[in-house]
Amino acid sequence: MAINHLLEIKEYGQSIWMDNLSRDIIQSGELKNLVENQGICGITSNPAIFEKAIANNVIYDADIEAGVRAGLPTYKIYESLIFADIRNACDILRPVYEASNKLDGYVSIEVPPTIAHDTQATINEARRYYQEIGRENVMIKIPGTEAGLPAVEQVIAEGINVNVTLLFSVQSYINTIWAYIRGLEKRLAEGKDISQIASVASFFLSRIDINIDGKIDAKLARGVDDISLEAKLMVVKGKVAIANAKIAYQEYKKIIESDQWQALAAKGAKVQRLLWASTSTKDPNYSDVMYVDELIGPDTVNTLPPATITACADHCEVANRVETGVAEAYQLIESLKDPDINIDINAVMDELLIEGINKFVQPFQSLMNSLEGKVKLLSPV
């Protein structure tokens, strides 16, 4: 019998979540099968995933029509659809949540991307989503923007599970884990239990390589006379995201060894795990599981789209690699400053955050528009 590498990865301390959710996979039993037999122990969703699930799918039409008859505005109809899917997915994952002592079994749902730069609106929506969905194993996604992190701190203090999303730079990750720590400290100071709260920090991968590879390709296209310069550029291609992630993991290790974290751990606090996101390979020249193989290790999560789950189950090469090649990772990131390469990684990360928010705003607005069209069709004349 062939080895299912997804189950093998779990033995190295990494949880595999799925970056996909739709009513189809819930009702068909596919999600239940993935959870019970394939080792999937969490779900992440985002506005792009919901647009794909809902926009051209008749499975939602009866609920849309019910919302129209009830006189609900389009946005409330949208929420009724996604909240129902989130609740059902939470129920399927509840046994995992219980069996893992609340480490896994979460379903992530993002606050509206249109409020990414509004702290108070993010806090309000996170509270409302958590209360209205009404499942302990729901995890609210909050973008790791300057405005998002104070919201993370506050909702953690209130006992809400948080997935901090759209993290690209190591510094943004460091800021995120400290926001989590401050939230726990605030909750502890109020005499409340901190042992039941979970959080992950979603660190994005493939988008970094797409951006930097594009810059390298542009340099190569302009022509490079020196063979050694061409070699320098080629060494960087497809390597920056993984190097960046390995450095972030080193920062994680430093922080959890600190006295400040150890004081919280003594009270039962769960570590905020790094979650590798954007893990499907976009370049056909790269391995379709490279963002899995290279980042397996303790206290991590990898959220995979369905195609990558299938590929990984088939041919991942499972080993603890998140802590290998660390010196080389630092060297690679440092090499971007070389005048011959001259890529400002901080500028790239800032660019990717702005782009990342837009990539969620656009499908969110597109879905609102398509829902509005359905609402008009189904409304009584």
UniProtKB/Swiss-Prot annotation:
UniProt xrefs under Gene3D superfamilies: Aldolase class I
E.C. no: 2.2.1.2
Catalytic residues of the enzyme: K141
Enzyme class: transferase
Predominant location category: cytoplasm
UniProt key word Mitochondrion: no
Subcellular location: Cytoplasm
UniProt xrefs under CDD domains: Transaldolase_like (cd00955)
A UniProt-annotated Pfam family: TAL_FSA
Transmembrane segments: none
Annotated keywords: Cytoplasm, Pentose shunt, Schiff base, Transferase
Pathway, per record: Carbohydrate degradation; pentose phosphate pathway; D-glyceraldehyde 3-phosphate and beta-D-fructose 6-phosphate from D-ribose 5-phosphate and D-xylulose 5-phosphate (non-oxidative stage): step 2/3
UniProt GO cellular component terms: cytoplasm
Function: Transaldolase is important for the balance of metabolites in the pentose-phosphate pathway.
HAMAP family, alphabetized: Transaldolase_2
UniProt-recorded name of the protein: Transaldolase 2
Taxonomic lineage of the native organism: Bacteria, Bacillati, Cyanobacteriota, Cyanophyceae, Nostocales
